[in-house]
């Protein structure tokens, strides 16, 4: 356990930040999954509404990823890789349709 007041405070701060980061990462993963579900639904049944739904989900995921990168929850390259993967999935389905 921490021996000094400052060390104790750092333990408390790091725990607070860990929980905050965990919530952010969870939200990012949830939106990525929703985006991939929307993309696969569009791939199974191509329609203008499906494409719009997939693009909306992609936009929401991009926004959350960018905010996580801005708050240093995700590394810049990790965020870019996640966004590129989502864009690639939508592009692949769009070209097949």
UniProtKB/Swiss-Prot annotation:
Bias-annotated ranges (Basic residues): 76-85
Cystine connections: none
Compositionally biased intervals (Low complexity): 86-97
Residue ranges of the region described as Disordered: 76-97
Keyword Transport assigned: no
An MF annotation (GO) of this entry: small ribosomal subunit rRNA binding
Sequence intervals crossing the membrane: none
InterPro entries linked: Ribosomal_bS20, Ribosomal_bS20_sf
Keyword annotations: Ribonucleoprotein, Ribosomal protein, RNA-binding, rRNA-binding
GO terms of biological process kind: translation
Cellular component, GO annotation: cytosol; small ribosomal subunit
NCBIfam families xref list: S20
Record function comment: Binds directly to 16S ribosomal RNA.
Similarity annotation: Belongs to the bacterial ribosomal protein bS20 family.
The protein's name in its UniProt record: Small ribosomal subunit protein bS20
Source organism of the structure: Microcystis aeruginosa (strain NIES-843 / IAM M-2473)
Lineage: Bacteria, Bacillati, Cyanobacteriota, Cyanophyceae, Oscillatoriophycideae
